[in-house]
């Protein structure tokens, strides 16, 4: 069965993750930062959106491509960085990179990644972005930037 049929909504994915992942790993993914205020606000805003199908009406294909920082992407969204993604699935960031490249959307790698920056970059290519949490050490900071840039 195709994943889209097994998991018709995010709620189904949520329940499957709770069953499959170790508790510490699930809690990391499921929670927000701090008191979770941002997570609560995002959920409330999304709950206000209603998608209304319009049957038996004329329709035209929608062009969803967008240019951002001089590069053309197929969609106006990308794959956000997730720290310690490898705790959820081995080499998850590399899977994200492949999916982002295939879909031609930006894909971000967190400073708290579980794969080599260079391996991610080799797969993501121009679609790869790097989310830098600057360390106190200027030397380490410069090294991270150099590795992400090259």
Where do the model's predicted regions map?
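Hydrophobic faces of well-ordered beta-strands that scaffold small-molecule active sites
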Residues: 77-80, 107-109, 128-132
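Glycine-rich phosphate/pyrophosphate-binding beta-alpha loops
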Residues: 81-87
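An N-cap/entry alpha-helix motif that binds or orients negatively charged groups
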Residues: 1-70
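Conserved, mostly hydrophobic/aromatic
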Residues: 22, 79, 100
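Active-site-adjacent beta->alpha loops and helix N-cap segments on the catalytic face
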Residues: 88-91, 109-125, 134-143
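N-terminal small/glycine-rich loop or linker at the start of catalytic domains
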Residues: 17, 71-80
């Amino acid at each position: 069965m195709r994943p889209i049929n097994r998991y018709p909504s995010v709620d189904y994915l949520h329940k499957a993750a709770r069953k499959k992942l170790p508790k510490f790993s699930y809690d990391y993914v499921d929670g927000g930062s701090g008191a979770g205020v941002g997570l609560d606000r995002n959920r409330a805003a999304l709950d206000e959106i209603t998608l209304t199908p319009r049957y038996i009406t004329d329709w035209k294909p929608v062009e969803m491509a967008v240019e951002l920082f001089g590069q053309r992407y197929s969609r106006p969204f990308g794959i956000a960085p997730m720290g310690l993604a490898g705790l959820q699935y081995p080499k998850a960031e590399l899977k994200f990179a492949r999916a982002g490249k295939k879909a031609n959307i930006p894909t971000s790698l967190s400073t708290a990644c579980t794969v080599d920056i260079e391996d991610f970059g080799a797969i993501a290519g121009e679609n790869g972005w790097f989310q830098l949490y600057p360390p106190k050490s200027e030397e380490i900071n410069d090294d991270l930037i150099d590795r992400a840039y090259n």
